[in-house]
Regions:
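Active-site and adjacent substrate-binding regions of carbohydrate-active enzymes
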Residues: 1-209, 213-236
Length: 236
């Protein structure tokens, strides 16, 4: 695609997929770290990154506990199929909770008030159980919030042509724990490293990158390894 000038649509979330931070990261212990790592993973790629509503806040799956809370017809039908296959109620709800399209269809979490500030009426579907902590108002003026991190990503993409127009080379394709790639345009080079696991992994640096400048990361300091869901962007 790159060789012929192709252009990708880059996204984790949409109205038919579970929330990325719950699906590919951690929506508990490493919620912030994994949400920011997933953002870096695609926002430094070649193409157009999409931000689905609430993704910039780290919105999670809603953690529904009853089938009565779901509205998605596929989820309701799949519930019946799983129960007919003698899956227990607990196991069935666990499967639905991980896969349902309703995971990304709950109202936008605006603030900590009733119905997450989305409406004074009755929403057609329930609100995620963590809306009092995860909402736009809580992050609006917080410099260390996920929302602020997204603003930094957008600003860097506008400022640095290598991100929007440079070439991309993926590295270490056999390492399932790591997403790594290089961006370059003849003037600037970037190295993007993303730990996809909830554990520490090795931090491989190609030749010539040991003394590179740290452009961005989701941990305040620098380590010789990649910590759980850590992302690092180096520049030279």
């Amino acid at each position: 695609m790159q060789a012929h000038g192709g252009w990708n649509a880059l996204f984790w979330c949409n109205h038919d997929q579970p929330r990325a931070v719950s699906r590919f990261g951690s929506d508990t212990t490493y919620w912030k770290e994994s949400a920011e790592m997933l953002a870096v993973a695609i926002h430094f790629m070649r193409g157009t990154p999409y931000i689905y509503q609430g993704e910039e806040l780290g919105m999670t799956n809603p953690h529904f506990t009853s089938i009565d809370q779901y509205r998605d017809v596929e989820s309701l039908n799949y519930y019946k199929i799983l129960r007919q296959q003698d899956k227990s109620e607990e196991e069935t709800l666990d499967i639905i909770a991980q896969r349902s399209r309703d995971d990304s269809r709950t109202p936008m979490q605006c603030d900590a008030s009733e119905n997450a500030g989305f409406t004074t009426g009755t929403p057609w579907i329930g609100i995620a159980d963590n809306y009092k902590a995860i909402n736009a108002a809580a992050q609006m003026d917080a410099p260390d919030s996920i929302r602020s991190f997204y603003k930094t990503l957008v600003a860097l993409r506008k400022k640095m042509p290598v991100i929007s127009a440079g070439k991309i080379e993926f590295l270490y394709p056999d390492n399932a724990d790591l997403l790594a790639y290089r961006r370059y345009d003849g003037e600037t080079e970037l190295l993007v490293l993303c730990n996809l696991r909830e554990r520490e992994i090795a931090k491989p640096l190609p030749v010539g990158w040991t003394d590179a400048e740290k452009l961005l990361g989701n941990y305040p300091d620098t380590a010789d390894t990649l910590r759980p869901y850590e992302c690092v962007v180096l520049k030279k």
